[in-house]
UniProtKB/Swiss-Prot annotation:
Major place of residence: cytoplasm
Keyword Cytoplasm belongs to the record: yes
Protein name, per record: Cysteine desulfuration protein SufE
Gene3D superfamilies, sorted: 3.90.1010.10
The family this protein is said to belong to: Belongs to the SufE family.
Lineage: Bacteria, Pseudomonadati, Pseudomonadota, Gammaproteobacteria, Enterobacterales
Function as written in the Swiss-Prot or TrEMBL entry: Participates in cysteine desulfuration mediated by SufS. Cysteine desulfuration mobilizes sulfur from L-cysteine to yield L-alanine and constitutes an essential step in sulfur metabolism for biosynthesis of a variety of sulfur-containing biomolecules. Functions as a sulfur acceptor for SufS, by mediating the direct transfer of the sulfur atom from the S-sulfanylcysteine of SufS, an intermediate product of cysteine desulfuration process.
Active site as annotated: C51
This protein's pathway: Cofactor biosynthesis; iron-sulfur cluster biosynthesis
C-alpha cells in the first residue's frame, strides 16, 4: 500500500488540515490514491451491507500471513473512508485486525463527530465486515 501514508503520517496530515473542508478533501484524495478494484471483485460476496453507498471490500492473506485489503465505493468520500480504514489495518495479520481498536485513532482525528449519521453507520459496517472476515481467517 505504498500509495497511502502510514498511520502516523495519516494522523499528522489530518491534524494539519485547517478546517473540515480541507479534511474532507484530504479523505477524498486518499480514496483517489487507492488502486482500482477489478470489476470481478465487485461481487455480492465482497459487498458491505449497512452502507448507503455501494461498498466492496476484498481481503486476501499473503504467504506471510499478512492481510491485504482492496476496496472501492461509488461515492468519493466513502472511498476515502475506506482508504483511512485500510491504512489503520495495514500490515496486520487476521488476529491483529480482530484485536485492534480503531476508535482511538478516529477520536484523535475527530473523524466520527464530523460525519453524517449514515456515513458513521457505513464506517462501522465496513469495520464490522473487515473484522468478521479477519476472524474467519484467524
Amino acid at each position: 500500500m505504498a500509495v497511502l501514508p502510514d498511520k502516523e503520517k495519516l494522523l499528522r496530515n489530518f491534524l494539519r488540515c485547517a478546517n473540515w473542508e480541507e479534511k474532507y478533501l484530504y479523505i477524498i484524495e486518499l480514496g483517489q490514491r487507492m488502486p482500482e478494484l477489478h470489476d470481478e471483485d465487485k461481487s455480492p460476496q465482497n459487498s458491505v451491507q449497512g452502507c448507503q453507498s455501494q461498498v466492496w471490500i476484498v481481503m486476501r492473506q499473503n504467504a506471510q500471513g499478512i492481510i491485504e485489503l482492496q476496496g472501492d465505493s461509488d461515492a468519493a468520500i466513502v472511498k476515502g473512508l475506506i482508504a483511512v480504514v485500510f491504512i489503520l489495518y495495514d500490515q496486520m495479520t487476521p488476529q491483529d485486525i480482530v484485536n485492534f481498536d480503531v476508535r482511538p485513532w478516529f477520536e484523535k482525528m475527530a473523524l466520527t463527530q464530523h460525519l453524517t449519521p449514515s456515513r458513521s453507520q457505513g464506517l462501522e459496517a465496513m469495520i464490522r465486515a473487515i473484522r468478521a472476515k479477519a476472524a474467519a481467517l484467524s
